Amino acid sequence: MARIAGINIPDQKHTVIALTSIYGIGKTRSQAICAAAGIAEHVKISELSEEQIDKLRDEVAKYVVEGDLRREVTLSIKRLMDLGTYRGLRHRRGLPVRGQRTKTNARTRKGPRKPIKK
């Protein structure tokens, strides 16, 4: 298994698909990384040479991925909450942030139903 950005990349998958196992890299960014490194998308990770894997590592290092990206997202949400913005209040209350209805639905964000005590 190749190790890129602190993640074990699956050997048996094609390069484009395997790179998407890194948090912060989707299919489009993965294709861009492969193009920049000069690696064909349909080649499996196990077929790559160590030099090609190093090129992939260098290209992935140019992006904010994994722990740094998670930290960045968490800090931006915390900043919204500290500022007291509407979005921050919705995050704090555990409600949908982007204007979805809450009279019905919104169960994923709100959690399981709580029975009404009489």
UniProtKB/Swiss-Prot annotation:
InterPro entries: Rbsml_uS13_C, Ribosomal_uS13, Ribosomal_uS13-like_H2TH, Ribosomal_uS13_bac-type, Ribosomal_uS13_CS
Cystine residue pairs: none
Keywords: Ribonucleoprotein, Ribosomal protein, RNA-binding, rRNA-binding, tRNA-binding
Gene3D superfamilies: 1.10.8.50, 30s ribosomal protein s13, domain 2
Region (Disordered): 91-118
Entry's Gene Ontology BP terms: translation
A GO MF term: structural constituent of ribosome
Record GO cellular component, one term: cytosol
Record family assignment: Belongs to the universal ribosomal protein uS13 family.
Assembly notes: Part of the 30S ribosomal subunit. Forms a loose heterodimer with protein S19. Forms two bridges to the 50S subunit in the 70S ribosome.
Protein role: Located at the top of the head of the 30S subunit, it contacts several helices of the 16S rRNA. In the 70S ribosome it contacts the 23S rRNA (bridge B1a) and protein L5 of the 50S subunit (bridge B1b), connecting the 2 subunits; these bridges are implicated in subunit movement. Contacts the tRNAs in the A and P-sites.
Protein's UniProt name: Small ribosomal subunit protein uS13
Organism for this UniProt entry: Photorhabdus laumondii subsp. laumondii (strain DSM 15139 / CIP 105565 / TT01)
Name of the gene encoding the protein in the UniProt record: rpsM
